[in-house]
Amino acid sequence: MLNNAMSVVILAAGKGTRMYSDLPKVLHTLAGKAMVQHVIDAANELGAAHVHLVYGHGGDLLKQALKDDNLNWVLQAEQLGTGHAMQQAAPFFADDEDILMLYGDVPLISVETLQRLRDAKPQGGIGLLTVKLDDPTGYGRITRENGKVTGIVEHKDATDEQRQIQEINTGILIANGADMKRWLAKLTNNNAQGEYYITDIIALAYQEGREIVAVHPQRLSEVEGVNNRLQLSRLERVYQSEQAEKLLLAGVMLRDPARFDLRGTLTHGRDVEIDTNVIIEGNVTLGHRVKIGSGCVIKNSVIGDDCEISPYTVVEDANLAAACTIGPFARLRPGAELLEGAHVGNFVEMKKARLGKGSKAGHLTYLGDAEIGDNVNIGAGTITCNYDGANKFKTIIGDDVFVGSDTQLVAPVTVGKGATIAAGTTVTRNVGENALAISRVPQTQKEGWRRPVKKK
């Protein structure tokens, strides 16, 4: 169906008192992303010409958090209802475009449902998203005559008979810009709350003989709003359950779907296995046959085919080629790169460092600002001393180097191919190819040494 041009209004002015937080409610995160960002992303995916964000409390925090989004900021200085919020945005509406109204605290609304609503909107009428609830207490009821929608009555203004209606208003609707402006201008606050309700435009449209078409969402969770942290946590679990289900159906083996969190986008190959309590953040790519152990956090990284990540390892902004093994308890920080078959063991940290093909750093090591060749052995307790308190310097280690345990490499320094660094050495000058570097203090031995004893 050919749709009119469309702009989106997102209401995000509420204080969120029941969150008990200094952060504006809509900035609280779901799956690692602000609730309002989920809604903005949906609007953009729908192809909105403009996104008008109506804000009030915490405006500076909102603008800082959403500075990269192309938004038209609309101030609602006083919170006098949803109709009042839309009135603030109305001057920006074009007469010949459709206006879709969304909410910053309803984060799981799907693009598919919104597109169906957009397609269903009758010419000159209103498309309305409604849902039926077993217990509709507190929600605005949809009134009908001969099956046709005639209006919405807020719970506090409803009669006992109207309160028996189970079909409720979700608050999400779409209408033509010129019509919307005309109806908004006619709103009054003659109700129990003394507020301007956007829902009153439904009755105004009906009085003009305009058609109102109701559409239902695919899932109830799509239209559930967040007023407190309990509701937010419940929606988080709904979202994560949906993501886990998609991954399982796509062939990813999640050992326990209830203990997996996806806070971004996961691209994966075949026969991927993910153990419990794993968190995926940002954009992550997993190759074929990747195995991730329990308790790992993977963020903005590419993991090649046949890699194995042992439990409680953190990988951030890193790249692993095929057949690498890391962990347990390893940390790859931004700029870490492992070439094919490399191994990083327990309590090893890498940052802005490359570990070559078949090279190994097995235990208790820090590799920062380093370039390490192929088939290198990094002994336990090795440290690249890359920082002098003001500037960072690079360590370069050639192919086939053996670095003994408890070695300090004071950068800038280069170790040539095939060199050997003796255990306990502090390397302060370049080491030539196939050379042995050793800087230990000569060992002394005192025979018959008696240990000190405590004085009584």
UniProtKB/Swiss-Prot annotation:
UDP-N-acetyl-alpha-D-glucosamine binds at residues 11-14, 25, 76, 81-82, 103-105, 140, 154, 169, 227, 333, 351, 366, 377. The keyword Cell wall biogenesis/degradation applies. The keyword Nucleotidyltransferase applies. Keywords: Acyltransferase, Cell shape, Cell wall biogenesis/degradation, Cytoplasm, Magnesium, Metal-binding, Multifunctional enzyme, Nucleotidyltransferase, Peptidoglycan synthesis, Repeat, Transferase. SUPFAM superfamilies: Nucleotide-diphospho-sugar transferases, Trimeric LpxA-like enzymes. Binds 1 Mg(2+) ion per subunit. Catalyzes the last two sequential reactions in the de novo biosynthetic pathway for UDP-N-acetylglucosamine (UDP-GlcNAc). The C-terminal domain catalyzes the transfer of acetyl group from acetyl coenzyme A to glucosamine-1-phosphate (GlcN-1-P) to produce N-acetylglucosamine-1-phosphate (GlcNAc-1-P), which is converted into UDP-GlcNAc by the transfer of uridine 5-monophosphate (from uridine 5-triphosphate), a reaction catalyzed by the N-terminal domain. In the N-terminal section; belongs to the N-acetylglucosamine-1-phosphate uridyltransferase family. In the C-terminal section; belongs to the transferase hexapeptide repeat family. This is Bifunctional protein GlmU. It comes from Escherichia coli O157:H7 (strain EC4115 / EHEC).
